[in-house]
């Protein structure tokens, strides 16, 4: 154990090179391929801190439930008859069978298919099968001893639900930090609130989860990987009612940039070249009156990809999307995507939003398949151990520590600013946070190991 921890610590310490004097910025490709690092990530990142779960609109009515996987653990989110939300481990308190085996539905109680124990949708054990004749001890069901296990931390920010399997984490708003301002920019576009539209797409790619996390903030690849999308849009017959889309050239030919925030969060933004095709454009006067010229301009004329570490992107660009990243193995990742929209928007705006979403984001769209091909190609390429480093230095001569001019104008306070959307500065902050979390995890495991050795000596 001691040797394993020491080896992992060396790997993590050497995973990122930030040499400002010589402008060398790179990460070691083993962070995408090492199974031991992956196990630590699952335990200490995905099961040890805040992780995005769902949006409140996915559990809208009393009795509704929604199931998901948090790290490696099955979770169910319910809304009880008092309209309160609960996040519970989706595992029977008796022998561990999954209680709820559908993705969504509406039930006020759950009966375990294995032995028939029944639980309220707030987690309370209502009855065990044959409880009166089962010769259970007096302590059975005492003070909730056999209720379902609630997540230690479960909280909403502006309708977005987050949970943690560890109680000792910082307050959610402190964890989100500066990104709260960007979430506000998205939510405040909708006077009646946001809703996730019915239907989702899920796909699995053969690559590490960090490939997907990097990609959503990668403005450099757009004009290369997604040239087919840009070319198709430029040739579409709009006079024949073809769907109008945000100009993909905005990622390279317009103003834009990227920010690395505390806690590993990232933002990629651009100035839209043709904002009039976005559904929000029709509401610019209302937004100006309600929020002022500066914030309204950000909402209407800028696109944004917001990564909330470690597992979700909130995208407000070609269309609007929630993209959830779920690691399965060191070289296998599941992604699930939804379109979200303002409640009560017009049929015309809703149809446009969905068509724009289908064009690029959908599994059958013109963006997603291209990205997945590159993910699997990178994962295979990372096995070339004779070339162990990935370069992250694009834009290094113009990166800004802290806030650049745009961030100052927007009221953001990032750790690092890339002043072009193709710059890779935000990855430095992103991977540095990974490194910080993993080193802290090593210290935790070392303390546990030392304590166990001490206890053995005391017993002996």
Name every feature range the model reports, one short phrase each:
Residues 84, 152-460:
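C-terminal catalytic domain of Rieske-type non-heme iron oxygenases
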Residues 47-60, 133-137, 303-309:
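Short Pro/Gly-enriched beta-strand edge/turn motifs at strand-loop
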Residues 1-14, 451-460:
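Basic/polar N-terminal segments that are highly enriched at the extreme N-terminus
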Residues 9-29:
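Short, contiguous pre-domain boundary segments
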Residues 46-50, 97, 221:
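Generic structural signal for secondary-structure transition and capping sites
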Residues 31, 35-46, 51-70:
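Glycine/alanine-rich phosphate-binding loops at beta-alpha junctions
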Residues 58-181:
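Rieske [2Fe-2S] iron-sulfur-binding domain
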């Amino acid at each position: 154990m001691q040797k394993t921890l020491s080896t992992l610590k060396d790997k993590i310490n050497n995973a990122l090179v930030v040499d400002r004097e010589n402008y060398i910025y790179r990460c070691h490709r083993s962070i995408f391929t090492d199974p031991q690092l992956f196990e630590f990530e699952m335990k200490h990142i995905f099961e040890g801190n805040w992780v995005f779960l769902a949006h409140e609109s996915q559990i809208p009515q009393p009795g509704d439930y929604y199931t998901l996987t948090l790290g490696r653990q099955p979770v169910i989110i319910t809304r009880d008859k008092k309209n309160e939300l609960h996040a519970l481990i989706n595992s029977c308190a008796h022998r561990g069978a999954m209680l709820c085996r559908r993705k969504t539905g509406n039930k006020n109680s759950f009966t375990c298919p294995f032995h028939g124990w029944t639980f309220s949708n707030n987690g309370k054990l209502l009855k065990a099968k044959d409880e009166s004749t089962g010769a259970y001890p007096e302590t059975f069901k005492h003070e909730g001893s056999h209720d379902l296990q609630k997540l230690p931390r479960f909280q909403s920010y502006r309708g977005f639900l987050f949970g943690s399997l560890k109680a000792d984490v910082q307050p959610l708003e402190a964890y989100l930090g500066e990104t709260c301002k960007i979430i506000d920019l998205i939510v405040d576009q909708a006077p009646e609130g946001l809703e996730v539209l019915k239907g989702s797409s899920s796909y699995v790619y053969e690559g590490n989860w960090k490939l997907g996390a990097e990609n959503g903030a990668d403005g450099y690849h757009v004009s290369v990987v997604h040239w087919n999308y840009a070319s198709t849009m430029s040739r579409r017959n709009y006079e024949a009612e073809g769907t109008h889309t945000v100009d993909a050239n905005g990622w390279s030919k317009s103003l834009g940039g990227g920010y690395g925030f505390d806690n590993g969060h990232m933002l990629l933004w651009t100035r839209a070249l043709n904002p009039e095709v976005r559904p929000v454009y029709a509401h610019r006067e209302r937004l100006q009156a309600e929020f002022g010229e500066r914030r309204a301009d950000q909402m209407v004329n800028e696109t944004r990809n917001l990564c909330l570490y470690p597992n979700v992107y909130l995208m407000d660009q070609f269309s609007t999307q929630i993209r959830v990243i779920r690691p399965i193995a060191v070289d296998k990742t599941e992604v699930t995507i939804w379109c979200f929209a303002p409640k009560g928007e017009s049929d015309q705006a809703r149809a446009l939003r969905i068509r724009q979403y289908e064009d690029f984001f959908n599994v059958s769209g013109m963006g997603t398949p291209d990205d997945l091909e590159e993910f699997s190609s990178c994962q295979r390429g990372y096995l070339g151990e004779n070339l162990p480093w990935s370069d992250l230095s694009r834009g290094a001569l113009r990166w800004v520590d802290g806030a650049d001019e745009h961030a100052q104008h927007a009221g953001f306070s990032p750790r690092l600013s890339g002043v072009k959307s193709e710059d890779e500065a935000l990855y430095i902050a992103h991977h540095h946070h990974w490194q910080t979390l993993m080193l802290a995890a090593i210290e935790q495991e070392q303390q546990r190991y030392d304590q166990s050795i001490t206890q053995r000596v005391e017993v002996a």
